[in-house]
Amino acid sequence: MVLLGRNPQQLASVAGSLNGGPDAVETLAVAGLSEVPSLIERHRPGVIVNTVGPFTQTGIPLALACLKAGTHYVDLANELDAVLRLLDLNAEAHDRGITIVTGAGFGVLATEALTITLRGEREPALKAQVAALPAVEALGSAVLSSSVDVLAYGGRRYHDGRLVRNRFGADHIRISLPSGGSRQAVGVPTGELEAARRASGAGEVVAYSSEVPSGRIARALLPVMSVVLSVTAIRRQVLRLIEHLRLAPPVSRGEVSWAYARLEWADHSNAEAWLRTGEGYAFTGEVAALVADGLREGSLSAGAFTPGALFGPTLAVRAGAEILLSANKKAMS
């Protein structure tokens, strides 16, 4: 295993925390993203795992380098634009015998696993709602940079099978949890939106997240922030400031992360489910490791996929989650 990054001290710290210790892991410090594609093409590793956002900037260059090198590619992307662009590489990846998996973390897989489970063998749903409600110990500046890109992208939802714009913050939901209480979430253009559309077959799809402030005042400000950040010069300045000051977003602390999905069919029947797991980044690490191991074994289909589409909903269970279905269905754990 080789760890690449810009900070040698952080690389050494991560290497020391892995099984086998630093002696079993090689570290390589690079000046920036621009150096990595040539390294991939030169060394042709079996699998690359990209953990560095914003994935709208890092995903495509690294995935294209992997296609040239014959290397499988995995990332943790959850920005809708990044996920869509990576999935668009499906035909090229298939032709080259390479597998691309985007969204290999709590973001995408948690709600996707629920959607796949709820649909089962049924016909496509009419409507789908999914929500990611993670609890995390800490967030880094790369996460805040990804959040800036999501805000700049603007509101999105699927309507009548088409990806359409809507006002950022217009979609708002309060979700009751099986453990009691509830969580608020706001419609956000994340990779979960596309994964839910594909898994459910629904023409009407909304993806929600609790990681965006959901209070009334915050929802009123979100459209303004989205418009301001859509100006390229302003967004670049904000991203430079985040990197320079190592700013991080506020965290939603706790020991339990939740995800939620609800499908509705044309006959007015519906079903809902929840996914429960621990800290969000710990779950993400398990998912990414399982996906990378699966690709390293070399027995999976070539093409570009979200994790649930390639591995099925049991991937979430293997990573430590429990799926809780509505009363008339059986839980999966």
Give the location of each predicted region:
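Conserved beta-strand positions in the Rossmann-like core of class I SAM-dependent methyltransferases
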Residues: 2-3
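Helix N-cap at the beta1-alpha1 junction of Rossmann-like dinucleotide-binding domains, i.e.
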Residues: 7-10
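Glycine-/Pro-rich loop/turn segments that contact NAD(P) or position catalytic residues
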Residues: 55-155, 159, 195, 199
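Catalytic-loop motifs flanking and including active-site residues across diverse enzymes
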Residues: 110-114, 189-192, 283-288
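Conserved beta-strand segments of alpha/beta enzyme cores
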Residues: 24-26, 72, 99, 203-206
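Active-site-lining helix/loop region of Rossmann-like oxidoreductase modules
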Residues: 120-272, 282
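NAD(P)H-binding glycine-rich loop region in Rossmannoid oxidoreductase-like domains
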Residues: 18-85
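C-terminal helical cap and adjacent loop that interface with cofactors, partners, or active-site loops
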Residues: 249-333
